[in-house]
Amino acid sequence: MTGMLPLLAAVVSAAVAGALTVALLVLLPLLMAQPDDRYPETNTFVLRRMDTVMPLLTLLGIGLSAGAVPAAPVVSAAVLHALAVLGLLVLLTVSAIVLRRVNASIAAAPGPAELRVLRHRWRGWHLTRVGGALAAAVANTAAVLLS
């Protein structure tokens, strides 16, 4: 079973990267095109679901990676992946906190300028999250291929 842990960690990492990439391709254009009065509500709807599921999947990936480290012949590759996924978890958590606070402050009194700022902040954070998830998935794939 321990031989399967690196592969399971790779699958979870790919799922995280895939979900964030889908959000980049589908949700980001939707949020950018929302009318001003609908944006805070839609953004809150998306954030509650994405920012609840993604850290849980990322924690699962960390757990699988940690379990795979003793089993991996190339320990450095597994450690690299575990660190990449841990960094992604921190990034997901920080971005969720920042975006929820900004969204809550704007939802109280939304104006076009504030909503533009929120949209661009969300876009920037999301692009960073997608990049981190893809880097973690690549590191995990390398760990599996090298083991």
Regions found by a protein language model. Give the residues of each.
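Hydrophobic/aromatic residues within the transmembrane alpha-helices of Major Facilitator Superfamily
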Residues: 18, 93, 135-138
